[in-house]
């Protein structure tokens, strides 16, 4: 496994930022690390990159222990933190050459820099100062720097934070391409991010892992509760809908009604509407989104 974490714990004073979390990630996997602010996502990433020590537990990257083999771990990791640290007064290629030299690439530095500039789409920006670039292109510079030494594992903390919609799409596509031959651990609190990029998702809340599965399986967890959206043209008696067996909760939004049900009751609704003289404009069955699963797991 590229990443192995076992009973990882981090304590700040009386606060358990991480509480014995365990997970693994393999090559070719884009693993989404999803959770509300303060859940423990960034803390986990900082431990994996050797930035801060854990209180207890084991974390390994490509078989190397982050506590006792920190330098070996860093050779195998590319890290893009949430606040991308760049020298804004340096030119793009100049900065990447400097980074390559710091990483000890030696005679391979120029070829690797040129390769990364091409791969992340910086060819037209290579002679610009970093401070002149848009946020999206600055993220590309950060990704290029993180991949210069050809690491097996990429750790990306909120990689699309602050980008406009077009930049978000571009960076997501780039990460998906990178993830074909590397292990990518991607932290976010945006559900669409996970759905569009990740093979698997871990949901973390209050320092504990509350879910670890692929997206379809997570959505399947709450299939016992269906949402039926019904819209009527005229006024109806909500109490009649509530009396349908299987209807648990009704929420009204204008002339639309959201019914939380334990079974598919669309046929009963259609029959009752006809009997009561209600004009039924539309009725649809909605699957639980990852967002609804996330809310259920983190609102505890």
Where are these regions (language model features)?
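C-terminal coupling/interaction segments
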Residues: 261-300
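A generic structural signal for secondary-structure junctions
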Residues: 78, 95, 104, 202, ...
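Short, Lys/Arg-enriched, disordered terminal segments
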Residues: 1-3, 299-300
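ABC transporter nucleotide-binding domains
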Residues: 2-5, 10-205, 211
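ABC transporter nucleotide-binding domain
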Residues: 170-260
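Short beta->alpha junction loops/turns
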Residues: 66, 233-234, 262, 286
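A short linear hydrophobic-aromatic micro-motif
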Residues: 121, 246-251, 279-284
């Amino acid at each position: 496994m590229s990443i192995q974490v076992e009973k990882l714990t981090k304590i700040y004073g009386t606060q358990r930022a991480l509480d014995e979390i365990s997970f693994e990630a393999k090559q070719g996997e884009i693993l989404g690390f999803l959770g509300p602010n303060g859940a423990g996502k960034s803390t986990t990433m900082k431990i994996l990159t050797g930035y801060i020590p854990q209180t207890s537990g084991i974390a390994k990257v490509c078989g190397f222990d982050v506590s006792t083999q920190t330098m070996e771990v860093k050779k195998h990791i590319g890290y893009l933190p949430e606040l991308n640290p760049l020298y804004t007064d340096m030119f793009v290629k100049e900065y990447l050459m400097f980074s390559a030299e710091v990483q000890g690439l030696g005679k391979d530095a120029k070829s690797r820099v040129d390769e990364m500039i091409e791969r992340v789409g910086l060819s037209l920006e290579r002679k610009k100062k970093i401070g002149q670039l848009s946020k999206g292109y600055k993220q590309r510079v950060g990704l290029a720097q993180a991949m210069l030494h050809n690491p097996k594992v990429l750790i990306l903390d909120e990689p699309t934070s602050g980008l406009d919609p077009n930049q978000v799409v571009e960076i997501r596509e780039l990460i998906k391409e990178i993830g074909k031959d590397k292990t990518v651990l991607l932290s976010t609190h945006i559900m669409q991010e996970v759905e569009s990029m990740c093979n698997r998702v871990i949901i973390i809340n209050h320092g504990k892992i509350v879910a670890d599965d692929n997206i379809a399986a997570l959505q399947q967890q709450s299939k016992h509760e269906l949402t039926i959206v019904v819209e009527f043209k005229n006024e109806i008696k909500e109490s009649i809908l509530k009396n349908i067996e299987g209807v648990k909760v009704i929420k009204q939004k204008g002339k639309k009604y959201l019914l939380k049900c334990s079974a598919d009751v669309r046929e009963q609704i259609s029959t009752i509407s006809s009997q009561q003289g209600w004009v039924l404009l539309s009725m649809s069955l909605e699957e639980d989104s990852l967002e609804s699963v996330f809310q259920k797991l983190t609102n505890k």
